[in-house]
């Protein structure tokens, strides 16, 4: 795989002072690298293919559908509160810079469906943990997480627990 780290742009003080934002758009614009990212994240779950891929708003919406297509799974968006039009299951969560609510349509995940949760970045683990809680509220089974990047110093893995986690690059 190409060295992903070389394609990530740091944006200091975004979205607020003191935060260094990891911009993945510089990696996504390279078609060869994008294909490698999708294949590498997908291949970790090929033996036990999930039924659904849940992509976390917003950059999980970029990776999630491509991984779903690669694995032959359905795609489900996990959106910020108030953005989905039908009845939802929801969970409050904290990030490195805010508190928010995440929602998934109640009919998006059926009982015992195997679910892979996808996002671009694992930081504090708050968003990932909230998404797993919603999947479990809907009686789905979380089979793991897939992230392009991890900010390991923020210890997000501790919040997620014992689920399998695939990360392509740690910072």
Curated annotation (Swiss-Prot):
Arranged from A to Z, the UniProt key words for this protein are: Cytoplasm, Glycosyltransferase, Purine salvage, Transferase
Catalysed transformations (reactions): AMP + diphosphate = 5-phospho-alpha-D-ribose 1-diphosphate + adenine
- Entries under InterPro entries matching the protein: Ade_phspho_trans (IPR005764), PRibTrfase_dom (IPR000836), PRTase-like (IPR029057), UPRTase/APRTase (IPR050054)
| GO CC field | cytoplasm
Provide the GO MF annotations for this entry: adenine binding; adenine phosphoribosyltransferase activity; AMP binding
Q: Which PROSITE patterns match?
A: PUR_PYR_PR_TRANSFER (PS00103)
Subunit structure of this chain's protein:
Homodimer.
Q: Can you say what this protein is called?
A: Adenine phosphoribosyltransferase
- The organism is Natranaerobius thermophilus (strain ATCC BAA-1301 / DSM 18059 / JW/NM-WN-LF)
């Amino acid at each position: 795989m190409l060295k992903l780290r070389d394609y990530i742009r740091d944006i200091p003080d975004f979205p607020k002072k003191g935060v260094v934002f990891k911009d993945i758009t510089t990696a996504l614009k390279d078609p060869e690298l994008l294909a490698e990212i999708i294949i590498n994240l997908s291949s970790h779950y090929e033996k036990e293919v999930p039924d659904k891929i849940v992509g976390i708003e917003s950059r999980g919406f970029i990776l999630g559908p491509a991984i779903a297509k690669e694995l032959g799974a359905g795609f489900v968006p996990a959106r910020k509160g108030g953005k989905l039009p039908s009845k939802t299951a929801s969970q409050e969560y904290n990030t490195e810079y805010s508190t928010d609510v995440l929602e998934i349509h109640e009919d998006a995940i059926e009982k015992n469906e195997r679910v892979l949760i996808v996002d671009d970045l694992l930081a504090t683990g708050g968003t990932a943990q909230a998404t797993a809680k919603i999947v479990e509220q809907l009686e789905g089974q979380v089979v793991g997480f897939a992230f392009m990047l991890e900010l390991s110093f923020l210890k997000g893995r501790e919040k997620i627990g014992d689920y399998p986690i695939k990360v392509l690059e740690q910072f």
